[in-house]
């Protein structure tokens, strides 16, 4: 029973992530996909991109 709940919860979170990213892409359809996140479409994405870039820099 615990495994079933865990699997369903994980699938739910994965779907939220997928549709969340799709919604961001739909919010700014003319944006260049290689340009990075658009601050107007998702201001929080800029913060996460900066954190990810810093982690990549530290790791190498």
Swiss-Prot record:
<feature type="repeat" description="AXPX 1">
    <location>
        <begin position="27"/>
        <end position="30"/>
    </location>
</feature>
<dbReference type="GO" id="GO:0090729">
    <property type="term" value="F:toxin activity"/>
</dbReference>
<keyword id="KW-0732">Signal</keyword>
<keyword id="KW-0467">Mast cell degranulation</keyword>
<dbReference type="GO" id="GO:0006935">
    <property type="term" value="P:chemotaxis"/>
</dbReference>
<keyword id="KW-0964">Secreted</keyword>
<dbReference type="GO" id="GO:0042742">
    <property type="term" value="P:defense response to bacterium"/>
</dbReference>
<keyword id="KW-1052">Target cell membrane</keyword>
<protein>
    <recommendedName>
        <fullName>Mastoparan-A</fullName>
    </recommendedName>
</protein>
<keyword id="KW-1213">G-protein coupled receptor impairing toxin</keyword>
<feature type="repeat" description="AXPX 4">
    <location>
        <begin position="41"/>
        <end position="43"/>
    </location>
</feature>
<keyword id="KW-1053">Target membrane</keyword>
<keyword id="KW-0399">Innate immunity</keyword>
<keyword id="KW-0677">Repeat</keyword>
<feature type="modified residue" description="Isoleucine amide">
    <location>
        <position position="59"/>
    </location>
</feature>
<feature type="repeat" description="AXPX 3">
    <location>
        <begin position="35"/>
        <end position="38"/>
    </location>
</feature>
<keyword id="KW-0391">Immunity</keyword>
<dbReference type="GO" id="GO:0005576">
    <property type="term" value="C:extracellular region"/>
</dbReference>
<dbReference type="GO" id="GO:0045087">
    <property type="term" value="P:innate immune response"/>
</dbReference>
<dbReference type="GO" id="GO:0016020">
    <property type="term" value="C:membrane"/>
</dbReference>
<keyword id="KW-0472">Membrane</keyword>
<dbReference type="GO" id="GO:0044218">
    <property type="term" value="C:other organism cell membrane"/>
</dbReference>
<comment type="similarity">
    <text>Belongs to the MCD family. Mastoparan subfamily.</text>
</comment>
<keyword id="KW-0145">Chemotaxis</keyword>
<feature type="signal peptide">
    <location>
        <begin position="1"/>
        <end position="27"/>
    </location>
</feature>
<keyword id="KW-0027">Amidation</keyword>
<comment type="function">
    <text>Antimicrobial and mast cell degranulating peptide. Has broad spectrum antibacterial activity against both Gram-positive and Gram-negative bacteria (S.aureus MIC=32-64 ug/ml, S.xylosus MIC=2 ug/ml, S.alactolyticus MIC=12 ug/ml, C.koseri MIC=4 ug/ml, E.coli MIC=8 ug/ml, K.pneumoniae MIC=32 ug/ml, P.aerugiosa MIC=192 ug/ml, S.choleraesuis MIC=32 ug/ml, S.typhimurium MIC=32 ug/ml, V.parahamelytics MIC=16 ug/ml). Affects membrane permeability of E.coli. Shows hemolytic activities on sheep, chicken and human erythrocytes.</text>
</comment>
<keyword id="KW-0800">Toxin</keyword>
<feature type="repeat" description="AXPX 2">
    <location>
        <begin position="31"/>
        <end position="34"/>
    </location>
</feature>
<keyword id="KW-0044">Antibiotic</keyword>
<feature type="propeptide">
    <location>
        <begin position="28"/>
        <end position="45"/>
    </location>
</feature>
<keyword id="KW-0929">Antimicrobial</keyword>
